[in-house]
Every structure is written in C-alpha cells, then in structure tokens.
C-alpha cells in the first residue's frame, strides 16, 4: 500500500442519492470546484449515473451522481433512471443521502426505505440550511432524521453556498478504504467529452423552456471534431412530437439560437477551446418508452 508521510492512501466510491431536484448535482459540482453535472430547477434533470473524481493529496473520492429516485415508473426512461439510482447503492464505500431541510416528500420516503438497508457508512446531508434565519428550528428536523436512520451521520450543508462541505468531505475521507488510487490525479470524470457536450445542450433546453418543457427530449452528438483551434460539434435534439419541435425552435428560431449560444459558452470553458456548435431538432415518436431506442441513444442496460 502506497504511503505518504505516514498517511495511508485512500480511494473509494461515494454514491450521492436522493429524490429529484434536491441538490445532488449542485453538491457534486461544488465539491469538484467546477461544473461537471448539469443542473436546473426541473426534476429529473440528471438521467445517468456519472462519476466525479476528486483527488486531494492521499485521498481520491469517486463520487457517483445519480438520477433522483421517483415514483413514476410508467415509461422505460423512468424505469432506467430508477434502476440506475438504486444500483448506485451497491458496491460503494459511502452513501450520501441528500434531503431538503424545507420539506419531506413521498419520494424522500422512498429513498429512505432504500438506504435503510445500506450496511456501510451513511451520511444524511441536509441541504439548504443556509436559508434558515433561526438555526434552532433545524434541530427537531435533524433529530427526526437521526431517529429514522440511527446508524447514519446527519450533517447540515448548503450545496449552493458550500457551507460545511469541508466537514462533509473530511467525514467521507475518513470512511474510504486504504487503496491505491484508481484514476490519474488529473482525471475528473469517467464520461466522454461527447457525453458532456450533449448534457450541456440538454441543460440549456431545460433552463430555457420552463413550464413549456417537454420532458421527452434527449440530445445526441453526431460530430465532435477538433480542426485547428476550433472544436466542431453537431448536436441532434430528439423530441417526440411536432409541437415539441416548434417549442424548442421558437419564434423565427430565436429560442434554439439562445440554447446554442449558452451551451457553446459553457463548452468553451469546459473544453478550453473555441467551439462551433450546430443544433438540429428531429421528431422521433415514442423514443422515451422504447427500450431499443433508449439503448441506441446511450441509456445503457435496460
């Protein structure tokens, strides 16, 4: 086992689980110190498990950002996301259960019922505690959570503001097993650049559309090519109905131009290159409930 100044080298997997839209991806981004996982105010923004890798000195923590566990199981895409989230609880060294201090929902209860069978270290990260004016009001909620999961450690945090994340990371590191590092020190994810580009486009669509949002959208990268100092990316946006296509394109193409402009700016930061981004929208009816179509679009084992 590698040693540095008598400190053991530690490395392990950390699952971040919770209901949709509770702050899991925001937490991962803040821990990594850069944007990796896409975020929006809409539930089910995250669809795939994704690794975010942080190496600091002797410790390498490999975070698994998961889709929010939810009750809807009517479509193949929903079943895929729920299976991904549940699978993340297996074969990891630490589980972080993210909850919102402002409310407790049926979907929080669903996650609680799954994590109660976790045999390894479990940390309940109570998010958005920075918004409480009177901290004493938080104590009964923390006590209630501790009663529900007596073997868990309960920690108040703010994923957005970074409050108490140093303490959270220190607690995680303490639980990681003594291992050589699994990934190079400078690697931050297991996902390809194509995947990250597609996710950035999907994020901008979700943020732009608001209440009009068609959830039956996905993004496929058809071309990803570096030519000189310019990265050329062609992205295909798939929807299920003609009406959804019109919504994404917008009046005289203004909305898709905004989506492209915002996605391109983030891509240039992420890939450290000038980006030429072209977007197309195509109708593919019923893709979100077609297991064969989902597999062809990169949604893994169904």
Curated annotation (Swiss-Prot):
Main location: cytoplasm
Source taxonomy: Bacteria, Pseudomonadati, Pseudomonadota, Gammaproteobacteria, Pseudomonadales
Sequence ranges assigned to domain KH type-2 in this UniProt record: 201-285
Any GO BP: ribosomal small subunit assembly
UniProt-listed Gene3D superfamilies: 3.30.300.20, P-loop containing nucleotide triphosphate hydrolases
Protein topology in the membrane: Peripheral membrane protein
Stretches the record annotates as G3: 65-68
Binding locations of GTP: 18-25, 65-69, 127-130
Domain Era-type G span(s) in chain numbering: 10-178
Gene (name only): era
Protein name: GTPase Era
Compartment(s) where it occurs, according to its Swiss-Prot or TrEMBL record: Cytoplasm; Cell inner membrane
Segments of this protein annotated with the region G2: 44-48
Nucleotide-binding in keyword set: yes
GO molecular function: GTP binding; GTPase activity; ribosomal small subunit binding; small ribosomal subunit rRNA binding
Region span, G1: 18-25
G4: annotated span: 127-130
Region of interest (G5), ranges: 157-159
Family as reported in the entry's similarity comment: Belongs to the TRAFAC class TrmE-Era-EngA-EngB-Septin-like GTPase superfamily. Era GTPase family.
Job of this protein: An essential GTPase that binds both GDP and GTP, with rapid nucleotide exchange. Plays a role in 16S rRNA processing and 30S ribosomal subunit biogenesis and possibly also in cell cycle regulation and energy metabolism.
InterPro entries from the UniProt entry: G_ERA_dom, GTP-bd, GTPase_Era-like, KH_dom-like_a/b, KH_dom_type_2, KH_sf_prok-type, P-loop_NTPase, Small_GTP-bd
GO CC entries: cytosol; plasma membrane
Subunit structure: Monomer.
SUPFAM superfamilies: P-loop containing nucleoside triphosphate hydrolases, Prokaryotic type KH domain (KH-domain type II)
